[in-house]
Amino acid sequence: MDIFSWQLGLPSTLACLVFGYLLGSIPFGLILTRMAGLGDVRKIGSGNIGATNVLRTGNKKLAATTLLLDALKGTAAAAIASLWGVEAGMAAGLAAFLGHLFPVWLSFKGGKGVATYIGVLLGLVPVMVLLFAAAWLAVAKISRYSSLSALVATAIIPVALYATGNGKVALLFAVMTLIAWVKHRANIQRLMSGTESRIGEKG
C-alpha cells in the first residue's frame, strides 16, 4: 500500500476534519478545574491545560479525569470516523489532536497533545497503546520527568507502526510526533538546562 495515497474524497475528508477538530478542541482541563473551584489552570505551573499541569493543583482525581477525557476525545474522533474507513479515522484523529493543541475557544492556545495522541492511537491501532504506556512508564520511573517520558514514547510509536506494516498510520503519527515535539520545545530546553519540573512537583 502506498503510504502517500489518499482515497477518501474531499467532502468526506473535510467533514472528518471539522468533526475531529471540534471534538478535540474541548478544553477539559480548564473546564474541570474551574468547576472544581481551582481557578484557571493556565495561571499555574506550566500554564498548560493538560493533565500534567492539572496535577500541579494537587487534585490527583481531577488530573486523572482530565487525562481520560483528553484521551477519549481523540479515541472517539478516530473510532467513530473509522466506521467510514481508516483514512476517515486518520483525518478525524489528526484534527482532534490539532484541536487540542489549537482550540478556537481559547484563542488557539491549548495543550501539548500527549493524552489526545494516546487517544487517537487507541482509536486506530489499540495494541500500540501498550507499547506507548510501557515506554512512558519506564522513562518516568527512571527520570521522574513527564515530558521526557512523552518525548521518548511518541518517538517510538511511528517506528513501531512502520515496522509492523502500518505504513500510512505510521506517517500520520510521525507528523503528530513532530508537532508534539515542537509543542514541547520549552520542556526540551528545560530538560537540557536541568530546570524541568519532575512528576509530583507543583512548580
Curated annotation (Swiss-Prot):
Keywords: Cell inner membrane, Cell membrane, Lipid biosynthesis, Lipid metabolism, Membrane, Phospholipid biosynthesis, Phospholipid metabolism, Transferase, Transmembrane, Transmembrane helix. GO terms for cellular component: plasma membrane. Pathway: Lipid metabolism; phospholipid metabolism. It is a multi-pass membrane protein. It is found in: Cell inner membrane. The chain crosses the membrane at residues 13-33, 66-86, 88-108, 118-138, 156-176. It is an enzyme of class 2 (transferase). The keyword RNA-binding does not apply. Its EC number is 2.3.1.275. GO terms for biological process: phospholipid biosynthetic process. It holds the Pfam family G3P_acyltransf. Its main location: membrane. It catalyses: an acyl phosphate + sn-glycerol 3-phosphate = a 1-acyl-sn-glycero-3-phosphate + phosphate. GO terms for molecular function: acyl-phosphate glycerol-3-phosphate acyltransferase activity. Probably interacts with PlsX. Belongs to the PlsY family. Catalyzes the transfer of an acyl group from acyl-phosphate (acyl-PO(4)) to glycerol-3-phosphate (G3P) to form lysophosphatidic acid (LPA). This enzyme utilizes acyl-phosphate as fatty acyl donor, but not acyl-CoA or acyl-ACP. HAMAP family: PlsY. PANTHER family: GLYCEROL-3-PHOSPHATE ACYLTRANSFERASE-RELATED (PTHR30309:SF0), INNER MEMBRANE PROTEIN YGIH (PTHR30309). This is Glycerol-3-phosphate acyltransferase. It comes from Sinorhizobium medicae (strain WSM419) (Ensifer medicae).
